[in-house]
């Protein structure tokens, strides 16, 4: 557990475990070996999202230069719903990207497919679909987004692609909702991230990011280090970190297997649906997400409920109970 994951030449078995995890996840997300998929572990989904975003930025820049676009005329942009996790705001700030957010509202509690392509232009490095909106637990319709992107790409040489932020659903949907197409089954989904320490069932913190093909991970983002006993490639932002999370992820994959993960996620789903039904019976709350998709229960206070307390008061009282 005290071994450094970056020192792969000193601890080759750790590198082997990481590669096995990448292969297992690639299979789970329907990556095709013929497309030369690639992936890496990260400290969490925040790092994984940034790697996915950086790959999109560098790939866009290479495509734009070949097409003769003045890449300095406007700031590159990334299109995402306003329900994004804060790591995307950090990515945009750190790497000088305009974050174009498609507003959510009562009728659109995930990415608004009627408006999303209005935000796309030749300076768009990519679009992000979210499998598990932070505020509602809803899924973006990735299959619909794929169709919209496919239609757009047929009209312009300035192609755009999709990164799926599946921090929550990446290790849930494949087991509980296998009929939903959101992953590498879709042509324009080029990268996916997920958190191993959420529904991957590992202690914090570990994330994963995969690309469907090496062409979507520019060579400039793969660094070769030779001062740890051998020349080895690395693509993660962080460097030194413990191997314990990688070992924990591999152990879970082997220990639970597909059926074990499915059983655990089903129990979580059942608890979420039960909780939402009981909360609804209290009469004070409107259920926004009942846990029937991602097992996240989301509710809000009913308007004109006639009580003199707020959800913040409720949260404070719940903290008193631990």
Question: Which residues are covered by each model-predicted region?
Answer:
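Glycine- and acidic
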Residues: 2-9, 33-40, 72-75, 99-104, ...
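Short Gly/Ser/Thr- and Asp/Glu-enriched loop/turn motifs at secondary-structure junctions
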Residues: 35-36, 73, 289-296
